[in-house]
């Protein structure tokens, strides 16, 4: 059964997350994971988060009266090189595809901030207080920006726009909405097993995307890329056969677990957990079984082998279980199993 290669690996029932004091920083926790999977998943997700998520960024700027980036502007305290460095740090959210044109015009004295830019459509400036430049009295400045969408880092020489305009300065673009990603792998306990992995991913964004959503997008990218390597059709799960028109489940589920040839430890653990029938047992997941006191991986493997011989496995869903007259049914179908 090839599906055992992935079905028998333990995996988290859910992923938890919490936001830090800075709302743009979030930690995502996944546990328990098989030993080694914390490092494998953490490193892969980190790389995809930093390199492959799409975002918006300014790709070029035109400043009235400026021909190149090594100029200075009368009445503006910063030179053009410093202004461009400040422009690179403007964080944007844009749902539509680019390019788009934005304009800012301001007279001095005063500070020109990102929030002074006139946006269009659904575009949003995420750090409106960010300073672009400072104007002295009687100074003025008009700038036109080109905004585009993409992923990763694109240097200025790839942002050249050949539209014949003089003074259009291409700039480096950091499209990624992710600022920082780190991960930590620790040991965690599940039942009697002490060395499972606990993965904690900490993501800092520029506010264009929620950190939890960013992890989901990265996981979807990995899923899509890895699907190329799957060269087989996954076997379909076989439903539990109905052995009798009166029952909606296999009568073998009415067999009591104490009739199985289990070790004393395994049998006692099932008894203490009020698991009486096989139907009770197969609806338990591996994670639930490992949380049973004194129940370890050895007992889990023993039970899985016994169930496999009967064509059953843990984690099955039996909608009609338990029947109201389970004791009577167990006696009636005793000879059939």
From Swiss-Prot:
Recorded GO MF terms: DNA binding; DNA-directed RNA polymerase activity; protein dimerization activity
Transferase recorded as keyword: yes
Catalysis performed (reactions): RNA(n) + a ribonucleoside 5'-triphosphate = RNA(n+1) + diphosphate
EC number: 2.7.7.6
Region Alpha C-terminal domain (alpha-CTD), annotated ranges: 249-337
Region annotation (Alpha N-terminal domain (alpha-NTD)) ranges: 1-233
A Pfam family: RNA_pol_A_CTD
InterPro entries with a match to the protein in the record: DNA-dir_RNA_pol_insert (IPR011262), DNA-dir_RNA_pol_RpoA/D/Rpb3 (IPR011263), DNA-dir_RpoA (IPR011773), RBP11-like (IPR036603), RNAP_asu_C (IPR011260), RNApol_insert_sf (IPR036643)
Keywords tagged on the record: DNA-directed RNA polymerase, Nucleotidyltransferase, Transcription, Transferase
Entry's Gene Ontology BP terms: DNA-templated transcription
CDD domains assigned: RNAP_alpha_NTD
SUPFAM superfamilies reported for this sequence: C-terminal domain of RNA polymerase alpha subunit, Insert subdomain of RNA polymerase alpha subunit, RBP11-like subunits of RNA polymerase
Family statement drawn from the similarity comment of this UniProt entry: Belongs to the RNA polymerase alpha chain family.
Domain note: The N-terminal domain is essential for RNAP assembly and basal transcription, whereas the C-terminal domain is involved in interaction with transcriptional regulators and with upstream promoter elements.
NCBIfam families per record: PRK05182.1-2, PRK05182.2-5, rpoA
Quaternary context: Homodimer. The RNAP catalytic core consists of 2 alpha, 1 beta, 1 beta' and 1 omega subunit. When a sigma factor is associated with the core the holoenzyme is formed, which can initiate transcription.
Reported function: DNA-dependent RNA polymerase catalyzes the transcription of DNA into RNA using the four ribonucleoside triphosphates as substrates.
Name of the featured protein: DNA-directed RNA polymerase subunit alpha
Organism listed in the record: Bartonella tribocorum (strain CIP 105476 / IBS 506)
């Amino acid at each position: 059964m090839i599906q055992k290669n992935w079905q028998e690996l333990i995996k988290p029932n859910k992923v938890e997350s919490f936001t830090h004091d800075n709302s743009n920083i979030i930690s995502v926790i996944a546990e328990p994971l098989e030993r080694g999977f914390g490092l494998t998943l953490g490193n892969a997700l980190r790389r995809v988060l930093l390199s492959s998520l799409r975002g918006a960024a300014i790709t070029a700027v035109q400043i009235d009266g400026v021909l190149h980036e090594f100029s200075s502007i009368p009445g503006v305290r910063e030179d053009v090189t410093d202004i461009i460095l400040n422009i690179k740090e403007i964080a944007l959210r844009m749902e539509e595809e680019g390019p788009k044109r934005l304009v800012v015009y301001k007279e001095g004295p005063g500070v020109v901030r990102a929030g002074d830019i006139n946006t269009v459509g659904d575009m949003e400036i995420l750090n409106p207080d960010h300073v672009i430049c400072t104007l002295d009295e009687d100074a003025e400045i008009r700038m036109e920006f080109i905004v585009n969408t993409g992923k990763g880092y694109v240097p200025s020489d790839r942002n050249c726009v050949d539209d014949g305009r003089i003074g259009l300065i291409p700039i480096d673009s950091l499209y990624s909405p992710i600022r920082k990603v780190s991960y930590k792998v620790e040991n965690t306990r599940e039942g009697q097993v002490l060395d499972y992995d606990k993965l904690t991913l900490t993501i800092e964004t520029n506010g264009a995307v929620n950190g939890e959503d960013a992890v989901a997008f990265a996981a979807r990218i990995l899923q899509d890329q890895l699907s190329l390597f799957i060269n087989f059709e996954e076997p379909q799960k076989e439903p539990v056969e109905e052995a009798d028109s009166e029952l909606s489940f296999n009568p073998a589920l009415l067999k009591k677990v104490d009739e199985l040839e289990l070790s004393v430890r395994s049998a006692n653990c099932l008894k203490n957990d009020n698991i009486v029938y096989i139907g009770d047992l197969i609806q338990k997941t591996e994670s639930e079984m490992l949380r049973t006191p004194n129940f370890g991986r050895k007992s889990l493997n023993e039970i899985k082998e016994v169930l496999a011989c009967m064509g059953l496995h843990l984690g099955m869903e039996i909608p009609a279980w338990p029947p109201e007259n389970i004791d009577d049914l167990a006696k009636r179908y005793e000879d059939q199993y």
